């Protein structure tokens, strides 16, 4: 998950507590909740990203590092992937995986998504998977992503969304409000934590609204791809090569 400085101290502590407490079961629960479809959605998203060889990538809100490791394979030994997250327990698991994998092109850091510890124009690509909805100020996070991207750089975001077809919408609401918290209780003994995650998915904007937020943050060529009947959406956007200008040419 991602820390947001606009949270109250109580919320900050609560959110950190939630993700630290579910970290040991996080990978297992992702597979159970998505019926193992989360790997397929990520694979489809990465296929659309194209050739990443040699690129520098920031995997924001990296959690236990699943996407980070996939990205490291794609960039190869000449590329670099940094996984950043606020939860120390999530990062401990990610670092344990890294020790087993012995990847030399991955680095894991603890950090704040609202104030990224990187210079302007540091990365070719920024990814964020299922982390944006856990911050109350989505636009601020997107603006930070925009800042650390190089001109022409790309952002790719996978997040929960809201189906529009009635049958999918009803199934989505039933599943997220009732089934997902129940699965969290049964398999991870974490009913309250997964009720909180359900609420974050419920409150998160739909794919079209999120597209508009990307544009508001300064991105161009914003597109999205839906998965799971619209319950999940992958957004793709680009930081323009040309800086914006306030100068207007023409008659006054």
UniProtKB/Swiss-Prot annotation:
It comes from the Bacteria. Signal peptide: none annotated. GO terms for biological process: menaquinone biosynthetic process; methylation. InterPro entries: SAM-dependent_MTases_sf, UbiE/COQ5_MeTrFase, UbiE/COQ5_MeTrFase_CS. Pathway: Quinol/quinone metabolism; menaquinone biosynthesis; menaquinol from 1,4-dihydroxy-2-naphthoate: step 2/2. One of its GO terms (molecular function) is demethylmenaquinone methyltransferase activity. S-adenosyl-L-methionine binds at residues 64, 85, 112-113. Its EC number is 2.1.1.163. It catalyses: a 2-demethylmenaquinol + S-adenosyl-L-methionine = a menaquinol + S-adenosyl-L-homocysteine + H(+). Keywords: Menaquinone biosynthesis, Methyltransferase, S-adenosyl-L-methionine, Transferase. The keyword Nucleotidyltransferase does not apply. Belongs to the class I-like SAM-binding methyltransferase superfamily. MenG/UbiE family. Methyltransferase required for the conversion of demethylmenaquinol (DMKH2) to menaquinol (MKH2). This is Demethylmenaquinone methyltransferase. It comes from Lactococcus lactis subsp. lactis (strain IL1403).
């Amino acid at each position: 998950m991602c820390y947001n400085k606009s949270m109250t101290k109580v919320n900050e502590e609560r959110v950190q507590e939630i993700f630290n407490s579910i970290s040991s079961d996080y990978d297992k629960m992702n597979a159970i909740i998505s019926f193992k479809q989360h790997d397929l959605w990520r694979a489809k998203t990465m296929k659309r990203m194209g050739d990443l060889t040699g690129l520098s990538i920031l995997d924001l809100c990296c959690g236990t590092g699943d996407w980070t490791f996939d990205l490291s394979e794609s960039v190869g030994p000449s590329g670099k992937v940094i996984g950043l997250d606020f939860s120390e327990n999530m990062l401990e698991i990610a670092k344990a995986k890294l020790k087993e994998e012995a990847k030399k092109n991955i680095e894991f850091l603890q950090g704040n998504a609202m104030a990224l510890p990187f210079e302007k124009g540091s990365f070719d690509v920024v990814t964020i998977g299922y982390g944006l909805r856990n911050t109350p100020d989505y636009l601020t996070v997107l603006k930070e992503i925009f800042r650390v991207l190089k001109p022409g750089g790309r952002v790719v975001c996978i997040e929960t969304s809201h189906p529009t077809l009635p049958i999918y919408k009803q199934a989505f609401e039933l599943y997220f409000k009732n089934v997902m918290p129940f699965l969290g209780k049964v398999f991870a003994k974490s009913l309250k934590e997964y009720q909180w995650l359900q609420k974050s998915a419920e409150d998160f904007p739909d794919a079209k609204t999120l597209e508009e937020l990307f544009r508001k943050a300064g991105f161009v060529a914003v597109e999205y791809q839906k998965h799971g009947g619209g319950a999940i959406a992958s957004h793709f956007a680009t930081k323009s090569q040309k800086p914006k200008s306030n100068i207007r040419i023409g008659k006054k």
